Amino acid sequence: MKKILLAVLSVIVLLVLFVVCAYTMKWTKITNITDGIKDQIIGKKEEKKKETSEEKIRVATTIKAVESLVKAVGKDKVEIEKVVPDGTEIHEFEPKAQDILKLSNAKMFVYNGDELETWADKAVESVKNKNLKVVELAKGLDKLDVKENDILDDDKDDEHKDKEHDHADDDHKKEKKHEDKDEKKEGHHHHHDGKDPHTWLSLKNAKKYVEKIKESLIEVDSKNKEFYGKNAKQVTEEIDKLYNEYSEKFAKSTKKNFVIGHPALAYLANEFGLKQLSVEDVFGEGTPTIAKMKALVEYCKKHNVKGILTESTANKDVINTVSRETGAKVLPVYIMEDPAESLEYVEAMKKNLETIYGNLN
C-alpha cells in the first residue's frame, strides 16, 4: 500500500514539475517576444531621431560649376536639386512649373549671376517659400566687358601696327570702316553685349564662390559650422595649388594667344596673362565664306596654331571643318555650364589649364 501511495505521489510531483516548467518556458517566450517588440519600437524611434538630426540641406543649383562647388563644401550634408535639366543650354533656359517647384522645396538656391541666369529674380519672386536662402555667387565681383577678339581681327591688328608709320591716312579710313563693321556685327550678336557672365572660370573667383557657399551653409545649418569650414579650406587649398603651378608655367611660356570656338575663357586668360582668339565670328551662323576660311587657314599656319579649343559639349561639326582645313587639332575644354558634365570643378579646371599650356608649348 505504501508503495502504491509513494508511486502516486511521485507521479503528482512530476506532473506539478512539468506544469511549472511548461508555464515558465511559455512566460519566458512571451517575455522575449515582448522585449523584442519593445526593442524594435525603441530602435525605430532612435533611428527616426537620428535621421531627423542628420537631415540633409536641400540645395537648388543651376550650372555644373555651381553644383560642383556646393558639393565640395557641403559633401554628404547637402542634397542637390538641379533646377536646369541635364543637356540644357543655360543661355536659352526658361524655368517651367516643375523647375520652380524645386525652389519651393529647397532650403537654399545657389546660382551664378543675373548675367547668366536672367530668369532667376522672377523665379525667386514666384516661389512660395519665405525661408528660401538665395545666394548669387557672382554678385559684387569685378566683371570683364565682353570682347570679341575675333581671330582675323587680331591678325589685322598686327598688320596695322607694322604699317602704321607709313599709312596713317589709309589706316584711319580702315579703322573707321572696321568700327562700322563691328557695330553691325554687334547688332547681329546680342549675346556679346554687356558683361562676360563666365565668372566661375577664374580660379580667384572660384575661391570667393567657395567662401560665399560656406557662409551660406553655416547660416542655415550652424551646428555643422566646423564641417563646412574644413571642406571649404580643403577645396581652397586645391585651387591655390593649381593657380600657383600654372602661374609659373605660363610666365615662362613665350606664346600667349590660344584659339577657341566660343570665347568663354576670358577670365581664365586674364588671370594668367593670356589672350583667347575666337573663331566663332568667322563662322557666324553657319559655314564661313571661302575668303574667311582662307584667311583663317593662313592665320593658323602663320602663327603655328597647333590646336583649337572647343567646349566639351559643343557641336563639333564647325570646329572639325576648321581643324580639317588648318591641320590644327580639336581640343576639348570644360566650361561647366551643362549640369550633365561629369568632371568636378578643380579637376575640370586642371584639365583646361593642361590643355591650354600644352597647346602653347
Q: What are these language model-derived features?
A:
Residues 4-361:
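Extracytoplasmic metal-acquisition and chelation regions
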